[in-house]
A protein has these predicted regions:
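N-terminal glycine/threonine-rich, aromatic-flanked beta-hairpin/loop signature
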Residues: 38, 46-131
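Short, hydrophobic/aromatic-rich segments at coil-to-beta transitions
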Residues: 33-41, 63, 99-104, 143-148, ...
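Bacterial N-terminal signal peptides that target proteins for export
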Residues: 1-8
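Edge beta-strand at a domain terminus
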Residues: 81-98, 137-199
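Short polar catalytic/cofactor-binding loops
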Residues: 43-47, 176
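Hydrophobic helical h-region of N-terminal Sec-dependent signal peptides
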Residues: 9-14
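N-terminal helix-cap/turn-to-beta initiation motif at the start of protein domains
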Residues: 24-40, 56
């Protein structure tokens, strides 16, 4: 159980990989049409402490959805939970810190969680995530309550992030240790080493 909770903390630092912004200007390196499509982890991603994830993004020119699946094994076969996050996004301006990257704000419109094992269903229940009874394999909305290390949207409605596209690879900003990208001054100054790949 401690491993699962550590995994939740580690995954929360990646869960967004996303944020909200204003109209796209013609001089930005990344444009909404560059982001539109389906992007997924090319492999089972290690996030340390024997914790693993796969990220699956679906973006239009103004909305984003992330299905983040956490696993208990290096082959990404043993599912622990899925976090589904969705909302609007806008691109702001080119990053001064990272050449070729564009600042983006990704809004947290909705948050849903699905436990895939009973200990996590119990943990979600004990943490008062959502408003119903947690059952393995059943998704529940947690937008207002948050869930363990995922904040309610009222506490953090937007991630201030970076995006960069290189061929069929999409990079987001490197999330800070405290997972706080809720204000413009918290925007990353570097890209994550692990991209997602266009499908």
């Amino acid at each position: 159980m401690k491993t699962s909770l550590r995994l939740l903390a580690a995954v929360a630092t990646l869960s967004a990989a996303c944020a909200t912004t204003s109209a796209q200007g013609p001089k930005t390196a990344v444009k909404p049409q560059d982001l539109a499509g389906t992007w997924s982890s090319p492999t089972c991603e290690s996030i340390g402490n024997n914790n693993y994830i796969q990220r699956h993004f679906t973006l239009t020119e103004n909305t984003w959805t992330l299905n983040l699946v956490a696993f208990g094994d290096a082959q990404c076969q043993a599912k622990l939970f899925t976090a589904r996050i969705q909302g609007p996004y806008t691109l702001v301006k080119d990053s001064e810190a990272v050449p070729g990257a564009t600042e983006g704000n990704f809004g947290f419109g909705e948050l849903y969680m699905t436990p895939h094992m009973q200990p996590l269903a119990d943990a979600f229940q004990n943490a008062k995530c959502g408003s119903g009874t947690w059952k393995v394999g059943e998704e529940q909305r947690t937008t207002e309550t948050g869930c363990l290390f995922f904040r309610p949207t009222s506490a953090c409605g937007t991630d201030h992030d970076l995006v960069k596209v290189e061929g069929n690879q999409l990079f987001f900003g490197q999330r800070p240790a405290d997972n706080d990208m809720c204000a413009p001054e918290k925007r990353p100054a570097a890209l994550t080493a692990l991209p997602v790949v266009k499908r």
